[in-house]
Structures are given as structure tokens and as C-alpha cells.
From Swiss-Prot:
Binds 1 Fe(2+) cation per monomer. InterPro entries: ARD (IPR004313), ARD_bac (IPR023956), RmlC-like_jellyroll (IPR014710), RmlC_Cupin_sf (IPR011051). GO terms for molecular function: acireductone dioxygenase (Ni2+-requiring) activity; acireductone dioxygenase [iron(II)-requiring] activity; iron ion binding; nickel cation binding. Fe(2+) binds at residues 99, 101, 105, 144. The gene is mtnD. This is Acireductone dioxygenase. Its cofactor is Fe(2+); Ni(2+). The lineage of its organism: Bacteria, Bacillati, Bacillota, Bacilli, Bacillales. Catalyzes 2 different reactions between oxygen and the acireductone 1,2-dihydroxy-3-keto-5-methylthiopentene (DHK-MTPene) depending upon the metal bound in the active site. Fe-containing acireductone dioxygenase (Fe-ARD) produces formate and 2-keto-4-methylthiobutyrate (KMTB), the alpha-ketoacid precursor of methionine in the methionine recycle pathway. Ni-containing acireductone dioxygenase (Ni-ARD) produces methylthiopropionate, carbon monoxide and formate, and does not lie on the methionine recycle pathway. The record marks 107 as: Important to generate the dianion. It catalyses: 1,2-dihydroxy-5-(methylsulfanyl)pent-1-en-3-one + O2 = 3-(methylsulfanyl)propanoate + CO + formate + 2 H(+); 1,2-dihydroxy-5-(methylsulfanyl)pent-1-en-3-one + O2 = 4-methylsulfanyl-2-oxobutanoate + formate + 2 H(+). Pathway: Amino-acid biosynthesis; L-methionine biosynthesis via salvage pathway; L-methionine from S-methyl-5-thio-alpha-D-ribose 1-phosphate: step 5/6.
Length: 170
């Protein structure tokens, strides 16, 4: 279950109902998908082959199709980041630059952890700390950035409005 940390006051929201309500009020789509469907050989596997990535997409194809139909998404892929990722530190520096997109940024966490820091409607940033099974859609034009948690590893399904993917606006 995702948790929220509000930056300026360092307040945490950990209750599932309160997290969902907070995100809904901020216009952030949040869903919990059944991660137990993931085959054991893909759980916490950060060295994925193309076949592994295709298998992950197949496992969650129904959920991807459902959210895509509801929200108009047209493409998806799988990304894996870990200490074995070449240039991980450089990638994280780039991910941590505050930006926005003219379409939603959608991620479903398959393994590991990630954090989206999002500017709230009142101008205060909050972290959404994500774990396996969490799906988030950062709304279009919302200022945000992404980083990893202390374990520095994540496998995520990215879902896009267009086949070209997101274009960050810094």
C-alpha cells in the first residue's frame, strides 16, 4: 500500500482509506492491483530479458487493458532499474529534476519501490511512496519528479497516452 509524506510539515499518511482519499482529492489516480499474480521467477527480478518483460505485460494484460480503456492510454512497456543498471546515478539525477508532462504519467510497480514527489493543489509537494501492486497516474501538467527508495531498485510497467511516451517539460 502506498504511503504519503507531505514535505513542508513532514506528515505521513499510512492508512489505506486516507491515502486513497488524499490522492483522489489531489487528482491522482491510485489503484491497487493483485501482485500475487506475478510468477515467482519474476518477483524481485531486476535483470529482465525481453521475454520476462513480455511475460509481465501478459500477466497484467487485463488490468492494463481496463485502465487504458477508461483513461485513453495507447502504449505500455516495462522498465527495470537497479544497481546493475548502467549509469543508474546519472538516470536518477535526470529523473529527480522537477518537470511536468502534457499527459498523464502512469506507473505500476511490479517489484521494488519508487517515490513520486508531486506538487499538490496548494503548492506543497508530497511524496507517494510506492510498493509492488501500486498503480499511480500523475495528472497532466502536475509538477513532479521520480526517485527510488533506499533499496535503489524498481520494476515498473509504464503506461502512455501516446505511442511516443512522455515528453518532460522542465
Amino acid at each position: 500500500m502506498a504511503q504519503i509524506r507531505i514535505h513542508e510539515v513532514n506528515t505521513r499518511i499510512e492508512n489505506e482509506v486516507k491515502v486513497s482519499k488524499f490522492l483522489q482529492e489531489e487528482g491522482v489516480l491510485y489503484e491497487k492491483w493483485n501482485i500475487s499474480k506475478l510468477p515467482p521467477h519474476l518477483n524481485e527480478n531486476y535483470s529482465l530479458t525481453d521475454e520476462n518483460k513480455a511475460e509481465i505485460l501478459a500477466v497484467f494484460s487485463k488490468e492494463i487493458a481496463d485502465v487504458s480503456a477508461r483513461r485513453g492510454y495507447k502504449a505500455h512497456d516495462v522498465i527495470s532499474l537497479s544497481n546493475s543498471t548502467p549509469n543508474l546515478d546519472e538516470l536518477l539525477i535526470n529523473f529527480q529534476k522537477e518537470h511536468h508532462h502534457t499527459d498523464d504519467e502512469v506507473r505500476f510497480i511490479v517489484s521494488g519501490h519508487g517515490i513520486f514527489a508531486i506538487e499538490g493543489k496548494d503548492g506543497t509537494f508530497f511524496d507517494v511512496e510506492l510498493e509492488p501492486g501500486d498503480l499511480i497516474s500523475v495528472p497532466e501538467n502536475a509538477r513532479h519528479y521520480f526517485t527510488l527508495q533506499d533499496d535503489r531498485q524498481v520494476v515498473a510497467i509504464r503506461i502512455f497516452v501516446t505511442t511516443e511516451g512522455w515528453v518532460p517539460i522542465y
